[in-house]
């Protein structure tokens, strides 16, 4: 559908019987109204043509071949001079055959049928609105017991209130035997309400605003009672309060969307367009049909049987009528959601029929596979790997993917710069991978964002915009901080990349969808760009260090000299036999890059004169004196060098290269943020 802002959208919800009839009914040029499917047949076995008023009827759903009716007559489509617009013999319109992809039909049900999604799916919408146990409603829908319908100011044959009690269940079986079908209908319409019709009557009598008011009053009363001290009673009250909240939210949703509660009970059953449930002829002349066709046939058979019982036969016991209504209800349940009530229906080969729910839900359903997961132009797909050197708003795009996605832009660039005379020459240069092609590709990519999407896209952060950069290999590089929004990890996950073409799409991507502009969760407002998985493991490895204490590697006098003054060339000496001293962090990282020390090797790093360390009353582990009078106080994680007059000359802390690298990254990030903030103010 298209709203008032001209946005295309898809809305799923309950609709009225009038709306279903409007979708499926069409008026032929001769004034005849068609749309109701009354026969369970598909194609005639001799002529291989659709049966009239059947599941593939050309009068209802349109011609199989464009402009050709069931009789074989042909008319030019769209020609105003051609008259008439339909065949007077078979009643088929001369229209495009693509109408069979969206033209619906309907089945007029002989009795109301409850929509199984609203009854059996948890939470049950019908049970919530009626405030009745689900088991009780199921017994009513499937004709296990009945409601008495007391009529005011009139004498009633049954003096009952509410439900038949279980000890007098025999009434349900004995009363219908005394009435013919017509008499039983009169009696039942006056005295007893059973089946989905009883549910529909109760839903139609509901006032949603009164439900909201009463539920809020009851919720407040339960809140005022407080805790009783009995754990079981407190849990019962808590469950009741949660139920009232769900009931209020459901009623508000119905009011907001202009949905009537009784629409959850079907009187008209929509029939899908035939192209969405096709019958295909395979090798050998055999036919392969969609399971939905067989389920529709089952519904029509049972519905026609019930119609015959209610209209033609006058001596059928009422119990048989109720049993047939139950069969119609079960057939519609199987069509909508096979197996929701227990054992699913199977065919002759013990294969479970694929119902409407199975067609649309799941990874291989209509939405995730056909609509959301369909292949589109200007898109690609590849495995994601971590790109630790990337900025948060950038992603690494393999050259092979980038040149395919931006090929048209590169061709335009080659022609504009007079490097190619036509499209063919430009494509030839791209196939040969000339250096100028990569230069133009870099220019094109600088100002063009791309969209990355990881299925399933459950919330808006499942698709975000990035500035692409060329990388080697065949995998898409991604910053690890954006993984939580995508719910992705680097164990083989795949992501799709899309190129926004229009200027509006590019502006929307830059203003709303860039990853550095989506740092908070839209659901709860908490930060979502936080270190997870690989980053946490990396931080742990970076800062774990050597777990050995200071006492394991005793103080070595050769450590007193600065590392820069060391003249030894044996790298293993620094790596395994001592803990070197460094005057600053740059020397320590330089030694690590020269592979003189390991990432987790303990070392001593000169530190600023920290007042907290100076004022500490901790007792040193060891004190070593030198010949010139200076001495070293060695503690668990730091070392103090004092002069002969006990003045502090230097302070060294015991750390690792990993800790130093993390500290420098944090310090640079804070300084960069401070500079950006000062520029902004």
Curated annotation (Swiss-Prot):
Main location: plastid
Cross-referenced Pfam families: RNA_pol_Rpb1_1, RNA_pol_Rpb1_2
SMART domains according to UniProt: RPOLA_N (SM00663)
EC id: 2.7.7.6
One GO BP: DNA-templated transcription
Single GO MF descriptor: magnesium ion binding
Role according to the record: DNA-dependent RNA polymerase catalyzes the transcription of DNA into RNA using the four ribonucleoside triphosphates as substrates.
GO CC, alphabetical: chloroplast; DNA-directed RNA polymerase complex; mitochondrion
Co-factor: note: Binds 1 Mg(2+) ion per subunit. Binds 1 Zn(2+) ion per subunit.
Binding site for Zn(2+): 69, 71, 87, 90
Annotated Mg(2+) binding sites: 489, 491, 493
Keyword Oxidoreductase recorded: no
Quaternary structure annotation from Swiss-Prot or TrEMBL: In plastids the minimal PEP RNA polymerase catalytic core is composed of four subunits: alpha, beta, beta', and beta''. When a (nuclear-encoded) sigma factor is associated with the core the holoenzyme is formed, which can initiate transcription.
Highest taxon above the source species: Eukaryota
Top-tier EC class: transferase
Catalysed transformations (reactions): RNA(n) + a ribonucleoside 5'-triphosphate = RNA(n+1) + diphosphate
Subcellular localization, as worded in the UniProt entry: Plastid, Chloroplast
Name of the featured protein: DNA-directed RNA polymerase subunit beta'
Family statement: Belongs to the RNA polymerase beta' chain family. RpoC1 subfamily.
Annotated keywords: Chloroplast, DNA-directed RNA polymerase, Magnesium, Metal-binding, Nucleotidyltransferase, Plastid, Transcription, Transferase, Zinc
Required co-factors: Mg(2+); Zn(2+)
Native source organism of the sequence: Atropa belladonna
């Amino acid at each position: 559908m298209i709203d008032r802002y001209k946005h295309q959208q898809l809305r799923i919800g309950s609709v009225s019987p009038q709306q279903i009839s409007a979708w499926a009914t069409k008026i032929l040029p001769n004034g005849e109204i068609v749309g109701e499917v009354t026969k369970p047949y598909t194609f005639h076995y001799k002529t291989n043509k659709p049966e009239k008023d059947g599941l593939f009827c050309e009068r209802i759903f349109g011609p199989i071949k464009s402009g050709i009716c069931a009789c074989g007559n042909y008319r030019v489509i769209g020609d105003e001079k051609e008259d008439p617009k339909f065949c007077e013999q078979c009643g088929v319109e001369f229209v495009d055959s693509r109408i069979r992809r969206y033209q619906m039909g309907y089945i007029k049900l002989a009795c109301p049928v409850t929509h199984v999604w609203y009854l059996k799916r948890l939470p049950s919408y019908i049970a919530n609105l009626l405030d009745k146990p689900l088991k009780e409603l199921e017994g009513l829908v499937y004709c296990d017991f009945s409601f008495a319908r007391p009529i005011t100011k009139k004498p009633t044959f049954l003096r009952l209130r509410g439900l038949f009690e279980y000890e007098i269940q025999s009434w349900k079986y004995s009363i219908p035997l005394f009435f013919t079908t017509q008499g039983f209908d009169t009696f039942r319409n006056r005295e007893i309400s059973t089946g989905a019709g009883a549910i529909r009557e109760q839903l139609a009598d509901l006032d949603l605003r009164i439900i909201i008011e009463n539920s809020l009053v009851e919720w407040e009363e339960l809140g005022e009672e407080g805790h009783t001290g009995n754990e079981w009673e407190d849990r019962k009250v808590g469950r009741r309060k949660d139920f009232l909240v769900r009931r209020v939210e459901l009623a508000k949703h119905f009011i907001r969307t202009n949905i009537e509660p009784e629409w959850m009970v079907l009187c008209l059953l929509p029939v899908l367009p035939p192209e969405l449930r096709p019958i295909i002829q395979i090798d050998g002349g055999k036919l392969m049909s969609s399971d939905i066709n067989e389920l529709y046939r089952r519904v029509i058979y049972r519905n026609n049987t019930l119609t015959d019982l209610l209209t033609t036969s006058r001596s059928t016991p009422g119990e048989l009528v109720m049993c047939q209504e139950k069969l119609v209800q079960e057939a519609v349940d199987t069509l909508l959601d096979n197996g929701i009530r227990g054992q699913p229906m199977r065919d002759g080969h013990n294969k479970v029929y694929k119902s409407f729910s199975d067609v649309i839900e799941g990874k291989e359903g209509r939405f995730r596979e056909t609509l959301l997961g369909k292949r589109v132009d200007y898109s690609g797909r590849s495995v994601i790997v971590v790109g630790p050197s990337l900025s948060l708003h950038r992603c690494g795009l393999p050259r092979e993917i980038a040149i395919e996605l931006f090929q048209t832009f590169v061709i335009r660039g080659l022609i504009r710069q007079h490097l190619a005379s036509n499209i063919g020459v430009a494509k030839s240069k791209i196939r040969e991978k000339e250096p100028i092609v990569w230069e133009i590709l870099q220019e094109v990519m600088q100002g063009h964002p791309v969209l990355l999407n990881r299925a399933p896209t459950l919330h808006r952060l499942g698709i975000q915009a990035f500035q692409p950069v060329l990388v080697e290999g065949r995998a898409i590089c991604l910053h690890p901080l954006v993984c939580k929004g995508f719910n992705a990890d680097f164990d083989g996950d795949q992501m799709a990349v899309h190129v926004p073409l229009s200027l509006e799409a590019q502006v929307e991507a830059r203003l709303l969808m860039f990853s550095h502009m989506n740092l908070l969760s839209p659901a709860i407002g908490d930060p979502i760009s936080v270190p997870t998985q690989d980053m946490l493991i990396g931080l742990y490895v970076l800062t774990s260090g050597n777990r050995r204490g200071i006492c394991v590697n005793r103080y070595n006098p050769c450590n007193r000299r600065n590392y820069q003054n060391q003249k030894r060339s044996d790298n293993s000496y620094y790596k395994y036999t001592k803990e070197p001293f460094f005057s600053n962090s740059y020397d320590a990282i330089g030694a690590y890059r020269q592979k003189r020390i390991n990432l987790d090797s303990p070392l001593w790093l000169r530190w600023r004169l920290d007042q907290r360390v100076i004022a500490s009353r901790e007792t040193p582990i060891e004190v070593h004196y030198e010949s010139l009078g200076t001495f070293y106080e060695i503690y668990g994680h730091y070392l103090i060098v004092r002069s002969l007059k006990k003045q502090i000359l230097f302070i060294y802390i015991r750390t690792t290269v990993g800790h130093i690298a993390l500290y420098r990254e944090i310090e640079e990030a804070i300084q960069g943020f401070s500079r950006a903030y000062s520029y902004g103010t």
